[in-house]
C-alpha cells in the first residue's frame, strides 16, 4: 500500500498550476526556499552531489539545488505537480529528473544511491512519516545527508500555523494542514533513531511579519528543520 493520503494529494494537485506564482497559494514556499536552500548547502555542499528531493511538488527546491550544481531527481505522487515541475524546468533551462514514485518504492529500487536526500514540508501530509524517514535512510549513501522540515505539534503551532496562517493572515489556503499530523521534534528523533541516521542539527524557522521573511532561529515551536547524516 502506498504511503499517501488521496485527499492530501488531491489538495495539492488542484493547486499545481499555481505552484510557481510567487504571489499565490505557494508564496510561503517561495519565501522560505532561500533559507532552507542555504541551510542545506551549508551542510551538504551541493555542487557535484547527487540529490533526491522527496515530495518535490512543483520543483521549487529541486530546481534551486540543481542551480547550485547538484544532479537532482525529484519525486512526488501528484502527476499534476510533476507536470508543472517538468514544464518549469524546460522554461528555466535547469535540468531536473522528475518521476511519479513513492519514497518507499524508490528506496527498494535505488538503495544507497544519493549523497543528499531532502524531505521538506512533506512528513505532516503522509499517513506514516516513520515509513518515509526509513526510506530516506535507505536511499542515502554512507556518510550522506538527509534533511527534513515539518511542523511541531503544540498550542503555539496550532495558533500560528493553522489559525494564524490559514484563517487570519490567509497566507495559506484553509485546510492546508491537519494539526493532528504535526510532528514533535522528539517524535521525529525517534523515527530517526530507528534507522542508521544520526541527527547533526535541529533548527527552527521564524517568520518576521513586518519584513515578510523567514529566518533560521533556535525557536523550534512551529516550523523546524533537522539535518541528519548516515554513518560511514
Swiss-Prot record:
Protein keywords: Methyltransferase, S-adenosyl-L-methionine, Transferase, Ubiquinone biosynthesis
Keyword match Oxidoreductase: no
UniProt-recorded Gene Ontology molecular function terms: 2-polyprenyl-6-hydroxyphenol methylase activity; 3-demethylubiquinol 3-O-methyltransferase activity; polyprenyldihydroxybenzoate methyltransferase activity
One of the GO biological process terms: methylation
Positions that bind S-adenosyl-L-methionine: 36, 55, 76, 120
UniProt cross-references to Gene3D superfamilies, sorted A to Z: Vaccinia Virus protein VP39 (3.40.50.150)
Protein name per Swiss-Prot or TrEMBL: Ubiquinone biosynthesis O-methyltransferase
Record organism: Burkholderia vietnamiensis (strain G4 / LMG 22486) (Burkholderia cepacia (strain R1808))
Organism taxonomic ancestry: Bacteria, Pseudomonadati, Pseudomonadota, Betaproteobacteria, Burkholderiales
Gene field: ubiG
Amino acid at each position: 500500500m502506498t504511503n499517501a493520503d488521496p485527499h492530501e494529494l488531491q489538495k495539492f494537485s488542484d493547486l499545481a498550476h499555481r505552484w510557481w506564482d510567487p504571489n499565490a497559494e505557494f508564496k510561503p514556499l517561495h519565501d522560505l526556499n532561500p533559507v532552507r536552500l542555504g541551510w542545506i548547502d551549508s551542510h551538504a555542499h551541493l555542487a557535484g552531489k547527487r540529490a533526491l528531493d522527496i515530495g518535490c511538488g512543483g520543483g521549487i527546491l529541486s530546481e534551486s539545488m540543481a542551480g547550485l550544481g547538484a544532479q537532482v531527481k525529484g519525486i512526488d505522487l501528484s502527476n499534476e505537480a510533476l507536470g508543472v515541475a517538468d514544464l518549469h524546468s524546460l522554461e528555466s533551462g535547469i535540468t531536473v529528473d522528475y518521476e511519479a514514485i513513492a519514497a518507499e518504492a524508490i528506496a527498494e529500487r535505488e538503495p544507497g544511491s544519493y549523497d543528499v536526500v531532502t524531505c521538506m514540508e512533506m512528513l505532516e501530509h503522509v499517513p506514516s512519516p516513520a515509513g518515509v524517514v526509513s526510506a530516506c535512510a535507505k536511499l542515502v549513501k554512507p556518510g550522506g545527508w538527509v534533511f527534513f522540515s515539518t511542523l511541531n505539534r503544540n498550542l503555539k503551532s496550532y495558533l500560528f500555523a493553522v489559525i494564524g496562517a490559514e484563517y487570519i493572515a490567509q497566507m495559506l489556503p484553509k485546510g492546508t494542514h491537519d494539526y493532528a499530523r504535526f510532528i514533535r521534534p522528539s517524535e521525529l528523533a525517534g523515527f530517526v533513531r530507528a534507522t542508521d541516521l544520526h541527527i547533526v542539527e535541529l533548527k527552527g524557522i521564524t517568520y518576521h511579519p513586518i519584513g515578510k521573511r523567514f529566518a533560521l532561529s533556535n525557536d523550534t515551536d512551529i516550523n523546524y528543520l533537522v539535518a541528519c547524516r548516515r554513518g560511514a
